[in-house]
Amino acid sequence: MSTPSAPANPKVGFVSLGCPKALVDSERILTQLRMEGYDVVSTYQDADVVVVNTCGFIDSAKAESLEVIGEAIKENGKVIVTGCMGVEEGNIRDVHPSVLAVTGPQQYEQVVNAVHEVVPPKQDHNPLIDLVPPQGIKLTPRHYAYLKISEGCNHSCSFCIIPSMRGKLVSRPVGDVLDEAQRLVKSGVKELLVISQDTSAYGVDVKYRTGFWNGAPVKTRMTELCEALSTLGVWVRLHYVYPYPHVDELIPLMAAGKILPYLDIPFQHASPKVLKAMKRPAFEDKTLARIKNWREICPELIIRSTFIVGFPGETEEDFQYLLNWLTEAQLDRVGCFQYSPVEGAPANDLDLEVVPDEVKQDRWERFMAHQQEISSARLQQRIGKEIEVLIDEVDENGAVGRCFFDAPEIDGNVFIDGAGDLKPGDKVWCRVTDADEYDLWAETL
């Protein structure tokens, strides 16, 4: 007599949109579902239910989220929505009334419960038999991972609605962060990308209280966290660093090789008038002097930043001020966005002249051309120098990787001719042979 086959595990499809912080949220939800016996599938057709983790930061991101929700409904029919756009449930249901549930960001339990209601977990599921790794389910390649250290933000930048979506700053216990980092490294991660809405504010909400890791006291504070992370023997890269005065403390750690000499600081603009309208504190800051001082302490320092052009009230004089500032600052990696009104943002109520779309486009093009010249000149200086490269991809044409001044997805690449025995996750020393405004070409030593 044949033994009846066990019922199949329930299957979940998942779409993750938006920033690395949202990606970490997706990883947490998927880890919980996997521990409960759900299989994660890669097609709409194979899924019993689809979860869409949305982005709601700007209008174009909302449009993409609504488009993906519609695609999931068309291809599957059973869709649960979560993430930053989830705070606008009415707007989502106006366009897609058939979605089964809508939750906001960080509402992990509500998402999992919504999945339970659509397709319950198997009653006889034994979580001990699931091969969920200690570091959880990761959506990044095996050799790098995002390490989220806090949620929310205490700032009130006039163009931003993150505090209304994700709340005020809540720092994770320092011991938990370091335990997670250690698990990731043990699993094969070679690069930790430290993220949050405001990385340098870590611990402010708990008054930098002392926690414990491996039996030793560690302050819940950015500098001490970086010191501890540096003992793990992997690349540590800092993102979303607000330019607080205590950021100066991180530069000696970079100069000493404890963490990567890479700072991702979203300056947003340079004109004091525009920064004041944005409610950014840097309008009181001698930012150029600080950058000069940082580079004196750590000559290899790479600075990445993002800027907004076309903010309400921005004049041609303000824009020229920004271009001149870029010339002096000599930033290495730069992104630029045209200002887009965000529903609920205080900037919508500013009594300032709106910059026409065609002017925004013109300024964006001029900004990008100006910065490309700067970036290209800085990368040309790398030709002939030796760099350590972390390999991301290998194919028949060679290998593609990154060095210390390249974060994944947002920065450039290092192209290596001929892969040899290289594989993703390997580190290899190379000599730079060529460069353009974004990328390097190199040969192995």
Swiss-Prot record:
The keyword S-adenosyl-L-methionine appears for this protein: yes
Alphabetical list of InterPro entries matching this protein: Elp3/MiaA/NifB-like_rSAM, Methylthiotransferase, Methylthiotransferase_CS, Methylthiotransferase_N, Methylthiotransferase_N_sf, NA-bd_OB-fold, Ribosomal_uS12_MeSTrfase_RimO, rSAM
Residues of the TRAM domain: 380-445
Cofactor note: Binds 2 [4Fe-4S] clusters. One cluster is coordinated with 3 cysteines and an exchangeable S-adenosyl-L-methionine.
Sequence ranges assigned to domain MTTase N-terminal in this UniProt record: 10-120
Cofactor: [4Fe-4S] cluster
Family per similarity comment: Belongs to the methylthiotransferase family. RimO subfamily.
Protein name as catalogued: Ribosomal protein uS12 methylthiotransferase RimO
Source organism of the structure: Pseudomonas fluorescens (strain ATCC BAA-477 / NRRL B-23932 / Pf-5)
